[in-house]
Every structure is written in C-alpha cells, then in structure tokens.
C-alpha cells in the first residue's frame, strides 16, 4: 500500500510538473511573440517620426537614443547610428517580464535604413541653369579630396565632377578644374524639371526664414542643418557661415562674405562680384527671368562629396523600399 501510494504521488507530481512547464513555456512563447511585435512596432514608430534634425546634428558613428511606448504600453528602447551620411542602423529592443514567472523575455530587431534626399540635380561643383560669368581670379574645381578634418573621415571615397555644368560659361580656362572642366547642359529643360521636383521637398523639410533685404544672423551651428531664406532679393552684407543645406528662394547678392560647407541652392540669380563666396560642397542655381550667374574675384567653389551628402541628409527621409532585417530571438 505504501509503495502504491508513493507511485501515485510520484505520478501526480510528474503530471503537475509537466503541466506547469507546459504553461510556463506557453507564457514565455506568448511573451516572446509580444516582445517581437513590440520591437517591430517600435521600428515603425521611429521611421514614421524620423528625427532628421537630431540625427544630422551628430557626427558619423554617434548613436542617437530614444524611448518609445507601444499602443498597449510596452516600453521600447530605440538606437540610431549613422555609419554613412545617407545610411543609418536602427535597433529596437524590448524586454518583457513573463506573466507568472521571474524570467525576462528580450527581443531586438535591427534594420539598415537608406535615407532618400530630394533629387536635386548636382552635376558639377557649380550647376547652373543659365549662363555663368567668372573673372580671372574666380576658382572652381570638381576635384574631390579627403583630409584629416573631413566629416566622413580621411579614408572616404572621392569623386571628380565637372567644375561647371551650365548652358553657357564665360570664364578663363584656368578658373575651372575638373573632368571635364566644363560640361555644357544641352537640355536644361530636364535639369530644371528635376530641380522643380526637388524644391518643394527641400522647403517642406527645412526651416524657413523670411529674409527680404539683408540676411542677418546667419551663423554656423554645431552639426548640419537645412535653412531656406525667402525673399525677392536676399543680401549678405556682413560675414556669414553655414554648414548643411542653405537654400535661397529669390536672388542672392553677396556683398560681404559667405562661407558654406555643404550645398548652396539659389532659386534665382547669384551675384558675388563685390564679395567673397567660399563653398566646400556644391552650388546649384536655377534662376527665373535673367538666368545669368555673376561670380567675382573672391569666389572659391571646391566640390566635396562628403559635404554634399551630409547636407542632403538634412532633408532626407527613410526610403520606402524594403529593408534588410535581422532578428535576434534571445540576447
């Protein structure tokens, strides 16, 4: 009798233990699925509210962190790391405590996100839909080179472009250096169409400031930023600096000095005959009416692929094409 009772007790204990383990496994599996869905939701929330300004203010390789909450209240830790001006790694991590257990279920989902900037037609160091007039002392080069202070690092890829891409150029031969030094735009209609397609997106994704007359208070800030100056004629009469994308909706007349690291876009005329203009990156001019671009003795334009990409990243959004996906079921 004692042996029989012991066997019954052992069998009962085994059945209870098996049932408990099955319930625990089911709860852990349910928590894992919930954590996986939460991580996917966190990525979707982050991509929907892309932190362009916060991300582009950081150097390459720096991680931007934030915390989000799903619709049912699960906390999510999100990390964004830029490894390239137009590429970011986005990771969402979720840790949930399983119901009725001390175990914690963790899930991490990582995606490589490509950023898609507006299709601004950057063909040369200076791209102009119109005629470009330069002096003997104007210097423009499409030869890209990386140095120790480069935002993308001294070992980045380089690219050589034409010094000037325009419908017509009136400039001394030594003012242009590139391959070729001058590229004639035989079909300006297509270039203008590309510009007009990109312009609304640039305005929508940039800070806009009314600047009719003198564009005062233009100072370089940490990081890279996008700004649109709006006015029939914008004048720079003092010393001004900008890093990122600087766009002008109207004519730009430089009477003082303007230094731009990134991309300078003018939807109007550009006149630098009485001033100093230095650009490391690229310049795009799409004028209406009088299409002439007048450059002075102190105009220096140096093509820089990294500066162009960093500037365009300030107005870029995550691409809607499929992403590469890695799932880590357990950390």
Where are these regions (language model features)?
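N-terminal segment of the canonical double-stranded RNA-binding domain
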Residues: 1-3, 310-324
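Aliphatic-rich helix starts adjacent to a transmembrane/signal segment
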Residues: 3-38
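Generic hydrophobic alpha-helical segments
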Residues: 9, 22, 46-49, 53, ...
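Active-site-proximal helix/loop capping residues that flank conserved catalytic or ligand/cofactor
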Residues: 13, 36-37, 44, 124, ...
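Short alpha-helical scaffold segments that flank and stabilize functional sites
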Residues: 18, 22, 38-45, 49, ...
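Low-complexity, Gly/Pro-rich coil/beta segments used as flexible assembly/activation regions
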Residues: 33, 37, 41-91, 180, ...
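Short, ordered "entry" segments at domain starts
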Residues: 81-208, 219-311, 323-331
